[in-house]
Structure formats: structure tokens, C-alpha cells
């Protein structure tokens, strides 16, 4: 379970608003996770998420009602993401003895979030408010009987595959289960976060050992080895594709914190999301994001057939509010969703 120090105002900005929000809405109760496959653990988890969601409703309504000069209200509900991480690999036939219960728990989390949506819908009655519901990703499970072989962890450095290939040298930390330390003096590259491999480059990285003149050749060798790597249990290729960072820019991947190699996995071995492109499906689940729009200035009952990207949401909100689109915005207005727009005229 998680806890929150209610005396620390840094959770809230502006900081002086923290006590006001606490007095009006009470503390935000985080979720409680333990023994998630037991009936008791599952019940407590869902009850805690319902409490958390109820706080979000109270806080949202308090701020919207009291500060009626607001122009944009944004909130983030993370429960669906968390619950799918915990259950989706065991939520289809053949994956777990309680797969039906696990799938129902996922649906229950959606129903909890639906109560937040229901609480916000009355604000559309003024005819001047629009409501956007979006997600940054979906999730897909690994195939039944498959396990990730040690690459593409969402939150840290994955050593197993890169150690097998000879690029990362890691040693177990004494008296700590499944905790390793890296010998940087012998490590040419590491796999960090979901989809990146970083070369331990001399002159760039604190303990770099790879000479700059060897960089390109090493990158190509690692890519070749990733394609050749086979899961030891099933004999299948683990990596779907890998490319240099220059090549990855064609996919919209880039920036100073990205790795030297970008790769994605075959969904059999995935880590729920961030390890495969958006249109990948597996076992009836998809990585495609959600986009629902309703309210002032928007069409009613329409299904938009054009491709919509997450970066298109902000320009569309700007168009509805008749404000300038940010100078470096990468997306475009979803004109097909706007009231009065007709494709036949074009």
C-alpha cells in the first residue's frame, strides 16, 4: 500500500492551496495492493480505488464550482493503467485459473472511472464546455506460457539479455534477491527503460569505455545480435525490430534523453505497453489509445475515421477555445470532430 504525508504541501501547487483542498475534500487516499489474486485482496484493492476516485470527484467539483473563472481543467486518473499492469497478463483464457475474475477486475476499474465521467457531464449543460477523455496508450498481455527474458523493463535497467549478449557486465548484490550492480569498466552498453539501448560512450558518459570511432560499428553489431537473439524457452525471436536513433526519428522518436538504439518486442514477450507500436494487438487486447470528445463545438454521435494522435488533442482544444496553438506544437486540429465541418466541401 501507499501512504501520503498530509502535512507536506509540496504535493499541491500552488502550495498554499494544499490546506484549503484538504479542508474541503479530505486526504487523497492511495490504492492498497496486496495478494491481488485472493478474493479479499481483490476486494480491498477495488474499494481503495473507489475511495481514491471519489476524492478526485470531490476535488474536481470543488475547484470547478468555487473558481468559476477557470478556462481549462485537466486531471489524470491512473487506476486503469495500474490494474491492467497487475492483471492483464492473467486476464484471458489459458493464462490463469482465475482469468475471468481478473478480466472482471479490469472492467470494474473502468466502471469506477466511469463514475468520474458521470460526475463531470452536468458541466456540459452550459453549452460552453467541452469534455475530452484520452489515454496515452493501451495495454496488451504476453502470450500464455511466455515470459519476458529480461529486456524492456518499464522502470529501470534490464540486464539479462544484454548480459547474455556480452554487452552488460553485472553482478548480484550480496544478500539481496534479484538486485544487481553494473561493472561499468567492462560494460559496453545497457538496456534502460522500455525501448532504448545506451552505448557506454567515452567522453559522453561518466564511466564510458567505448571509443567514439567504434560507436557506429558497435551500434550495428548490437542491432544484429538483437535480431539473432532467441528466447531460450520457446526458441522464438524476441525483438520485433531495432534501429539507430537517426532511423527512429521517422517514427517520431527522439530527444536528448533517448538511447542510441530504439527497439520494440514481439508481443509474446511484452511488458504490457511501450514495447510495441500503437497498432499491435495480442490476445484480444490493443495498444491503441482512447479519444472521446463531447460538448460545445463538437459533433454528436460521430465516429472519426481519420487517424488521431495524442498530439492532436491540444490543437483541437485551442481551436475550440479560439486561442493560439503553441508555437512548437507537433499535432494538428481534428477538424472532422468540429461542429459545422463537412468533408464533402473539400
Where are these regions (language model features)?
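His/Asp/Glu-rich, glycine-adjacent segments
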Residues: 1-96, 195-208, 214-217, 221-236
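Acidic, His- and aromatic-enriched active-site or binding-groove loops in soluble protein domains
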Residues: 1-21, 94-107, 152-174
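Short secondary-structure boundary/capping segments
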Residues: 88-94, 146-161, 214, 259
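Acidic/histidine-rich catalytic neighborhood
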Residues: 118, 122-204, 340-346
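Extended hydrophobic/aromatic segments used for targeting, binding, or gating
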Residues: 72, 85-123
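Long, internal low-complexity/basic segments
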Residues: 307, 313, 318, 323, ...
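Active-site neighborhoods of enzymes that stabilize oxyanions during catalysis
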Residues: 165, 170-316
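Metal-dependent active-site segment of extracytoplasmic phospho-/sulfohydrolases and closely related
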Residues: 110-156, 237-246, 254-255, 259-267, ...
Amino acid at each position: 500500500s501507499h501512504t501520503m504525508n498530509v502535512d507536506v504541501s509540496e504535493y499541491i501547487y500552488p502550495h498554499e492551496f494544499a490546506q484549503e483542498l484538504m479542508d474541503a475534500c479530505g486526504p487523497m487516499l492511495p490504492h492498497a495492493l496486496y495478494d491481488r489474486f485472493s478474493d479479499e485482496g481483490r476486494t480491498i484493492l477495488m474499494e481503495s480505488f473507489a475511495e481514491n476516485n471519489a476524492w478526485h470527484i470531490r476535488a474536481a467539483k470543488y475547484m470547478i464550482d468555487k473558481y468559476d473563472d477557470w478556462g481549462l481543467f485537466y486531471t489524470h486518473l491512473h487506476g486503469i493503467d495500474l490494474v491492467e499492469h497487475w492483471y492483464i497478463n492473467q486476464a484471458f483464457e489459458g493464462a490463469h485459473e482465475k482469468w475471468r475474475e481478473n478480466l472482471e477486475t479490469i472492467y470494474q476499474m473502468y466502471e469506477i472511472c466511469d463514475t468520474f465521467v458521470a460526475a463531470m457531464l452536468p458541466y456540459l449543460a452550459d453549452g460552453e464546455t467541452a469534455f475530452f477523455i484520452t489515454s496515452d496508450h493501451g495495454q496488451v498481455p504476453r502470450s500464455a506460457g511466455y515470459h519476458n527474458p529480461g529486456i524492456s523493463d518499464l522502470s529501470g535497467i534490464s540486464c539479462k539479455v544484454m548480459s547474455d549478449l556480452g554487452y552488460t557486465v553485472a553482478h548480484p548484490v550480496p544478500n539481496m534477491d534479484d538486485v544487481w550492480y553494473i561493472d561499468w569498466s567492462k560494460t559496453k552498453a545497457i538496456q534502460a527503460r522500455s525501448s532504448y539501448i545506451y552505448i557506454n560512450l567515452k567522453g559522453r558518459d561518466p564511466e564510458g569505455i567505448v571509443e567514439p570511432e567504434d560507436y557506429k560499428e558497435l551500434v550495428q553489431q548490437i542491432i544484429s545480435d538483437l535480431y539473432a537473439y532467441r528466447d531460450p524457452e520457446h526458441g522464438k525471436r524476441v525483438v520485433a525490430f531495432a534501429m539507430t536513433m537517426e532511423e527512429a526519428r521517422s517514427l517520431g522518436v527522439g530527444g536528448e534523453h533517448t538511447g542510441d538504439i530504439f527497439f520494440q518486442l514481439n508481443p509474446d514477450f511484452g511488458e504490457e505497453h511501450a514495447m510495441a507500436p500503437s497498432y499491435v494487438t495480442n490476445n484480444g487486447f490493443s495498444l491503441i489509445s482512447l479519444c472521446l470528445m463531447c460538448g460545445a463545438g463538437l459533433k454528436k454521435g460521430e465516429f472519426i475515421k481519420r487517424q488521431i494522435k495524442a498530439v492532436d488533442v491540444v490543437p483541437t482544444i485551442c481551436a475550440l477555445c479560439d486561442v493560439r496553438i503553441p508555437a512548437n506544437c507537433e499535432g494538428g486540429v481534428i477538424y472532422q470532430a468540429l461542429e459545422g465541418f463537412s468533408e464533402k466541401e473539400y
